[in-house]
């Protein structure tokens, strides 16, 4: 994994997850920033690997390297616990699609990029244009290999919801691969802020 292009992201993440303060700003700053940084790293690496997920071994090494870099810049040493992140979060998990070519075959990538390449945080939280495009793409790739049950029935299954959520991570990584690292992080943070605000008012 090449961390050079994400050097500034890692620096910002280290500040947002600074030592003693990390647990107190976990949901507001630290964890969304950490998740965005990891998503951007995997998305950018897919340009060379054609994979939007890491295998188990590489995922362990990658997360460990990220931790070491962040700790070296003053971040908390307990980020895995604080943010409930593990190496499995860097894999495809239950999503049946992880290769870029397969992704492009199943998703209207032009529509997805148009909706998510540049979002206005306020408008996105109100109208959820990018969010809906991501959900549509995630649902599409989650359906790969599902022939036994019809789509409407499968939506009621807990396993289907988990799969769609795992595929959502794949979609976010693809989006990150199409944007420069700093702008990709901005888009991802905008989306996570909307999700957090939605949770507060539900």
Labelled PLM ranges:
Residues 1-202:
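Extracellular/luminal segments of secreted precursors and ectodomains of membrane proteins
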């Amino acid at each position: 994994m090449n961390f050079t292009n994400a050097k500034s992201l890692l620096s910002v993440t280290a500040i947002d997850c600074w030592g003693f303060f990390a647990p107190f700003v976990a949901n507001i700053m630290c964890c969304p920033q950490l998740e965005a940084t990891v998503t951007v790293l995997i998305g950018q690496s897919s340009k060379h690997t054609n994979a939007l997920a890491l295998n188990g071994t590489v995922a362990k090494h990658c997360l460990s390297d990220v931790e070491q870099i962040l700790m070296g810049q003053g971040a908390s040493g307990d980020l895995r616990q604080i943010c409930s992140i593990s190496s499995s979060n860097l894999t495809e998990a239950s999503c049946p699609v992880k290769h870029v070519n397969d992704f492009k075959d199943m998703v209207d990538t032009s529509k997805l990029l148009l909706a998510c390449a540049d979002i206005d945080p306020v408008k996105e939280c109100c109208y959820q244009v990018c969010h809906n495009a991501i959900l549509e793409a995630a649902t599409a790739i989650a359906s790969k290999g599902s022939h036994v049950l019809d789509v409407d029935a499968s939506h009621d299954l807990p396993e289907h919801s988990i799969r769609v959520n795992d595929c959502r991570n794949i979609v976010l990584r693809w989006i990150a691969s199409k944007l420069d690292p700093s702008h990709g992080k901005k888009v991802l943070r905008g989306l996570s802020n909307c999700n957090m605000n939605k949770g507060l008012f539900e």
